[in-house]
Amino acid sequence: MSNIEERVKKIIVEQLGVDEAEVKNESSFVEDLGADSLDTVELVMALEEEFDTEIPDEEAEKITTVQAAIDYVTSNAQ
């Protein structure tokens, strides 16, 4: 597991209050991890802060799974 992947999963566990074992790369934030729209906004904000990046709204809407978050950060982290 890459450092970015570990950090993303740690943020998801903290933000959504889920067990680390539930956080799989293919997990959907809403369907699998029980997030609501506010949770997803807060999750994006936490990712922006952790990785010192800005995620535009149109990109944030596409980040619906753990893997999508990892991929976005990997491609765009500074």
Swiss-Prot record:
4'-phosphopantetheine is transferred from CoA to a specific serine of apo-ACP by AcpS. This modification is essential for activity because fatty acids are bound in thioester linkage to the sulfhydryl of the prosthetic group. Residues 2-77 form the Carrier domain. Keywords: Cytoplasm, Fatty acid biosynthesis, Fatty acid metabolism, Lipid biosynthesis, Lipid metabolism, Phosphopantetheine, Phosphoprotein. The modification O-(pantetheine 4'-phosphoryl)serine is found at residue 37. InterPro entries: ACP, ACP-like_sf, PP-bd_ACP, Ppantetheine_attach_site. The gene is acpP. Carrier of the growing fatty acid chain in fatty acid biosynthesis. This is Acyl carrier protein. The keyword Cell inner membrane does not apply. It holds the Pfam family PP-binding. SUPFAM superfamilies: ACP-like. It comes from the Bacteria. GO terms for biological process: lipid A biosynthetic process.
